[in-house]
A protein has these predicted regions:
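Conserved N-terminal beta-strand and adjoining loop/helix that marks the start
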Residues: 1-25, 41
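Short, well-ordered beta-strand micro-motif
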Residues: 18, 89-93, 109-111
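Conserved Nudix-box catalytic region and its N-terminal flanking loop in Nudix hydrolases
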Residues: 24-60, 148-151
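Acidic/histidine-enriched, glycine/proline-rich intrinsically disordered or flexible terminal extensions
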Residues: 133-153
Length: 153
């Protein structure tokens, strides 16, 4: 193999499903030019951060909550131009603080049964499936002429 095939630009991301042990999950109605719809809190991993540090920081910035012991549920990745975006998906039911929305969008508790009925952001059906799996899962999303293909394994 050529080294070109082994080397690619990568952007690390994170997302966390937070549940309150009363049948509710925390939803974020994201408002943005590039990505909008109902999702979970999360964002970019900054240089020098661990993945867990980054998800704790992002959740705090977007919700005002401090999470503890996020559990890695899987990986969701997609190609955007010449960059592979790799999202680490976590879930937790341990948190403290007061819920505060940010400029990323409104955050609120919603029942687990109602969440999938929302106008979900792209890829969130697959993220939802990964978050509810008993084993870690991976999803690769590719965009083709026929549309978006999401391969879960």
């Amino acid at each position: 193999e050529t080294s070109e095939k082994r080397l690619e630009k990568v952007r690390f991301m994170n997302m966390c499903m937070i549940s309150d042990n009363k049948g509710n999950v925390l939803a974020l109605d994201k408002v943005g030019k590039n990505y909008s719809g109902t999702t979970f809190p999360g964002g970019h991993v900054e240089a020098g951060e661990t993945f867990i540090e980054s998800v704790i920081r992002e959740v705090f910035e977007e919700t005002g909550l401090t999470i503890k012991n996020p559990k890695l549920m899987g990986i969701y990745h997609w190609i955007s131009g010449d960059v592979r975006n790799v999202g680490f998906l976590y879930r937790t039911d341990e948190f403290e603080g007061k819920l505060i929305s940010s400029d990323e969008g409104r955050v609120y508790w919603i029942s687990e049964k109602d969440y999938p009925k929302k106008s979900l952001a792209p890829g969130m059906q697959q993220v939802w499936q990964i978050m509810h799996s008993d084993v870690p899962m991976e999803c690769l999303q590719t965009i083709t002429e026929e549309g978006i293909i999401a391969k879960i394994q």
